[in-house]
Amino acid sequence: VQRLPQYAIDKLELADVHRLSRGARIKVAVIDSGIDTSHPELAGALDRSGDMLTGQPARDADADSHGTGMASAVFARSQLTGVAPAASLLAVRAFKGTTTGDRSGAQGTSWHVLKGIDWSVAEGARVLNLSFAGPRDELVSRALAAASGRGVIAVAAAGNAGPASAPLFPASDPNVIAVTALDAENKVFAMANRGRHIAVAAPGVDVLVAQPSAGYGMTTGTSVATAHVSGLVALLIERDARLDLPQVRTLLTGTARDLGAPGRDAETGAGLINIRAALARMTQVR
């Protein structure tokens, strides 16, 4: 199989990391727009799908570029390499319509997100990928708290509303790991939201991902950075299923590569995720 170029593979040291963990048997729910689960990059990844808009299993006919791209950043296993290529996909459609760029959040409701979280937890998800951002919702916040209490780790995109924007939800919620985006030179994405709630940063500018109908394309934003971190969390949980949200947050922020001014900051949180260091620290902690 011809491999396609991905700078994130080297930046995240995936060749070395995958000798230690590939996310086997860990269910990661991608709560997003429709996912083309028939894409070669996602072959064999699907565990179950649910369409929160219809109450039925999700259909590949409703696949969208955003959801498909996010799923491939986690699970890709053909010409691309996902962060957790052996993990199991829970494909959760909570947003409808064709997305433009990184704006899938404009076409969903808190109710569909809420149903998606509950469905994912009931299906045994250990990781929730939340690559969307908007206004705070109390019911969704309660659902995230309940999920965390059951050992589920939610990872959320900081948002792409620019440095002057107020913190967006669910990234601003205490029961998620908030992620921002970096380019190949480790510069923060110019339109990423800033804030003290941001935990870590990951590759998120000009990232090659899968697109519907066996296609490929580039995506930029905190969404795909979040998917990279969700994959990392699956790798950690494969190594130790007892990990909870506070432990995962401590592992990620404690091993991240500091960027910018020394210490944690509103631009990049604790810095660039360091998967190898996080896995190594786990073995020391346990």
Predicted regions span which residues?
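Substrate-binding/access-modulating region of protease and related hydrolase catalytic domains
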Residues: F95-P174, K187-V188, P212-T220, V224-T226, ...
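Structural recognition of the beta-strand scaffold that forms the well-ordered cores
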Residues: K27-I31, G82, S88-R93, V121, ...
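Subtilisin-like serine protease catalytic core
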Residues: D16-R48, A58-T109, D173-N175, N193-H197, ...
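Sec-exported extracytoplasmic/periplasmic mature domains
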Residues: R22, I35, D47, F75-Q79, ...
